[in-house]
Regions:
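N-terminal regulatory/sensing modules of transcriptional regulators
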Residues: 1-9, 121-130
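C-terminal structural segments of small proteins and small subunits
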Residues: 92-110, 114
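Context-gated lysine
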Residues: 5-6, 55, 102, 109-110, ...
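C-terminal output/interaction extensions
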Residues: 107-125, 129
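Conserved binding/recognition cores within well-folded domains
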Residues: 2-93, 97
Length: 130
């Protein structure tokens, strides 16, 4: 996996994965979610879906600290695309809904709240710099 960093920032902009379709660089902010389907994982972006034969646990480690949360044993979601979480359902900006299991619900909700508060702080810093 190759990592590409943004200029003058520590944030990762894109990651290269060995998909079935070939080695492809995926911009982190375009990856909506990763879903397990049998023995492969599907990377859903706005444009298309890519498949890879790799454990979701491995993918989760690679995306750690980049705004993704494991909401289900089969789903890893980019929190930038979560509109809201309520009544054990994760509502995405794309209109899709993913069930959140009852035991994971408090963890997922807390991670999303932390993400929102950190995103708010980042926006405050940008406004102060302008």
């Amino acid at each position: 996996m190759a990592v590409v960093k943004k200029d003058n920032e520590n944030a990762v902009e894109a990651l290269r994965f060995p998909f079935v379709e070939g080695s492809i660089l995926i911009a982190v902010d375009t990856l909506i979610y990763v879903e397990t389907d049998r023995h492969r994982n599907l990377f859903h972006t706005a444009d298309r879906t890519y498949s890879i034969y790799r454990k979701l646990d491995e993918i989760e480690r690679q995306l750690d600290g980049l705004g993704f949360v494991r909401i289900h044993r089969s789903f890893l979601v980019n929190m930038r695309y979560i509109r809201r979480i309520s009544s054990y359902i994760c509502y995405l900006n794309t209109g899709e809904q993913i069930s959140v299991p009852k035991p994971r619900y408090p963890y997922v909700k807390k991670q999303f709240e932390l993400f929102l508060s950190n995103a708010g702080e980042a926006e405050d810093v940008k406004e102060m710099e302008a």
